[in-house]
Amino acid sequence: MPPINRQFDMVHSDEWSMKVAFASSDYRHVDQHFGATPRLVVYGVKADRVTLIRVVDFSVENGHQTEKIARRIHALEDCVTLFCVAIGDAVFRQLLQVGVRAERVPADTTIVGLLQEIQLYWYDKGQRKNQRQRDPERFTRLLQEQEWHGDPDPRR
């Protein structure tokens, strides 16, 4: 099995609870099929910041060699999501087995745009959670606002 050409670890990645990877040839766009990508770019994402954690460059290999896919999957072990242009169904399932969700996106989708969407979703989710936590009486009010119109005895 030929080794990975290069791997650059930028920061200690254990402090990042969310790591996402991008199949990219130019560091800026998602533009590659997962099985053929020459590079995976991995970012750590938090609600308030994003940091490049790792870049993994692969040897260009044609075909569907098992080792080629295994190296790419291994490079994603600590990631939660992979963004790519395309991925085979069998490899998609293999990624799910190691806890990585693959997302297909249109060619030339910007990595910055996807990172911003992830942060926005994270922020919105946090805001909704905070609103629920601030209103402990919400269920009581909901029950008072709505009447029960169902038959209390379903056997009738």
UniProtKB/Swiss-Prot annotation:
GO BP of this protein: nitrogen fixation
Q: Which SUPFAM superfamilies does this entry report, sorted A to Z?
A: Nitrogenase accessory factor-like (SSF53146)
Q: Which InterPro entries match?
A: Di-Nase_FeMo-co_biosynth, DiNase_FeMo-co_biosyn_sf, NifX-like, NifX/NifY_domain
Name the domain of life: Bacteria
Q: Which UniProt keywords apply?
A: Nitrogen fixation
Q: What family is this protein classified in?
A: Belongs to the NifX/NifY family.
Q: What is this protein called?
A: Protein NifX
Q: Which organism is it from?
A: Klebsiella pneumoniae
